[in-house]
Amino acid sequence: MEKRTSCSVQTSTNCDNSLETLNSAHQATGAVQMRIKNANSHPDRQSQTKSMILTDAGKVTEPISRHRRNHSQHVLKDVIPPLEHPMVEKEGYLQKAKIADGGKKLRKNWSTSWIVLSGRKLEFYKDPKQQALPNVKPRPNAESVDLCGAHIEWAAKDKSSKKSVFQITTASGNEFLLQSDIDFLILDWFHAIKNAIDRLPKNPSFGSLELFSFQRSSSSEQPSHCHIDRKEQKPENRKSFMFRLHHSVSDTSDKNRVKSRLKKFISRRPSLKTLQEKGIIKDQIFGSHLHTVCEREHSTVPWFVKQCIEAVEKRGLEVDGIYRVSGNLATIQKLRFIVNQEEKLNLDDSQWEDIHVVTGALKMFFRELSEPLFPYSFFERFVEAIKKQDSDAKIETMKSLVKSLPPPNHDTMKILFGHLTKIVAKAAQNLMSTQSLGIVFGPTLLRAENESGNVAVHMVYQNQVAEFMLTEYDKIFSSEED
């Protein structure tokens, strides 16, 4: 009886153990099914690796979470703004020649290119239509120059016999020559590219987007260092990445604070007129109005004009092609800068020994006046006067017009044309006739305010007026007190 009872108890115990085993197995199966169901219900998880790894001992290790979707998609998206195409700062046609590729010299071959300056890049196209091609990467026949670490300078004569040429040398050893016959155009390009280079770091690798590269998978966009294999990333690298990420967030907030302070400062700063009245900001000599320059110097003839004329008459009257030959543009710009800064100027200094630099600066001064030497309001009247057929009537009309000019215009004109008559007197040596000087100075001294009419016809009259002023100088300025 006791034996039967113990057997039944043992049987019951075994049954209970079997039931527990079945229940646990059922629960485990249900848990696995639940995990499978949950995994299938989230498509994003399908791309993740298996979370159960079977070791050699046949044991199941703890699940390893490799789900880093929050870091790569949510945090990074808020911190790093989407990349945008850089804004075009300048574009236009220039003559271009590539003379070196990676330090290897190339045969110089000039061609006209449509050049686009944007951010840290200078791009060359055949024409504007090629630049505008949508969604073409890379654009056909387009050449791009990285300005980071580049160097720009005015080209030496051994580089090119053309005038107004500057050279760009990139960090990779490529060399380009850019040129234009229009002085102010090539100057604008030189300063625009130089400013772009100065804004960039000197080290080409610094500032580029090498910190992170974005590697896309089917489920997420994960940031990684350019020089680290994703498969070999260690936990220390992940911590370092998160540190840099939080550091960039603080940098962004710092930049926003600086921007707000700058906006407040700019909104509170005094106006340009106030600064000019206090003498803090002064008008420059080049590019100003003739009356403004004379009023500031308490004279009717600008001091710079007098100095240039004296220098030319001292050592340039017999120089071949005086006023026709162009001087070195970089040296002319240096002279212009000194004059604008009101620094002491000595044109007898050895750096100004080339008389064509002095004449080039004088022509630039008259060309850049905000209103030409012949005022806009007198343009049509001088053109009508030069059209007269009767010589005496033409002289009298010209004389009357010159006499009615404002004192700064009248006195400066008298000194300038008096100087040019001395150039004509030496025409046998310098080969500069009245016609040649008329062509050089006509468009510089006399031009319409709005060139809406025939530019070619205007140019003919401009040259004729300047030439007539030289030919009849004594009669036009006769009976006037010096």
From Swiss-Prot:
Pfam short name (any one): PH
Topological category with respect to the lipid bilayer: Peripheral membrane protein
GO cellular component annotations of the record: cytoplasm; plasma membrane
SUPFAM superfamilies: GTPase activation domain, GAP (SSF48350), PH domain-like (SSF50729)
Protein origin, superkingdom: Eukaryota
Site residues by UniProt (Arginine finger): R324
Residue span, PH domain: 87-198
Chief location category: cytoplasm
Alphabetized CDD domains for the sequence: PH_ARHGAP9-like (cd13233), RhoGAP_ARHGAP27_15_12_9 (cd04403)
A GO MF term: GTPase activator activity
UniProt-annotated location(s): Cytoplasm; Membrane
Segment forming the signal sequence: none
UniProt keyword terms in alphabetical order: Cytoplasm, GTPase activation, Membrane, Phosphoprotein
Gene that specifies this protein: Arhgap15
GO biological process, one term: small GTPase-mediated signal transduction
Protein name, entry field: Rho GTPase-activating protein 15
Disulphide bridges, residue numbers: none
InterPro entries according to UniProt: PH-like_dom_sf, PH_domain, Rho-GAP, Rho_GTPase_activation_prot, RhoGAP_dom
Domain comment (free text): The PH domain is required for localization to the membrane.
Phosphoserine: residues bearing it: S51, S111, S205, S208, S250
Role played: GTPase activator for the Rho-type GTPases by converting them to an inactive GDP-bound state. Has activity toward RAC1. Overexpression results in an increase in actin stress fibers and cell contraction.
Domain Rho-GAP: 288-477
